[in-house]
A protein has these predicted regions:
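Acidic (Asp/Glu-rich) sequence patches and key acidic residues
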Residues: 1-103
């Protein structure tokens, strides 16, 4: 299974399901919008495999994009176990997501 984050209608990032779920959970953590947190957790809990950032409110979308650009890769470097198979490739995929978010 895989998952996709639509950063914009023409900018999509896909990854293995576990990495998609890790990213969505990380993005949901500590958001100020309870409804957005519930929606993001539902995506993971129900194995929906899709997060469209345009479906979020403008304020939440801006915050999620900021986190993708500035926090997600560093967090992966800290949290993903060094023994994780293909760890460097997973972090590189998150870098790709960060680059997509730069101009969104």
């Amino acid at each position: 299974m895989s998952g996709t984050i639509a950063v914009a209608p023409d900018k999509r990032w896909s990854a293995a399901g576990w990495l998609f779920e890790w990213a969505v959970e990380a993005l949901a953590e500590d958001l100020d919008d309870d409804a957005a947190v519930a929606s993001l957790r539902e995506i993971v809990d129900d194995n929906l495999g899709w997060l469209g950032l345009d479906d979020l409110s403008p304020a939440v979308r801006a915050e999620v994009l900021r986190r993708i650009r500035t926090e997600l890769v560093d967090r992966a470097d800290r949290e993903l176990p060094p023994t994780l198979p293909n760890r460097s490739e997973a972090v590189d995929l998150l870098r790709d997501l960060s680059r997509l978010a730069e101009n969104a």
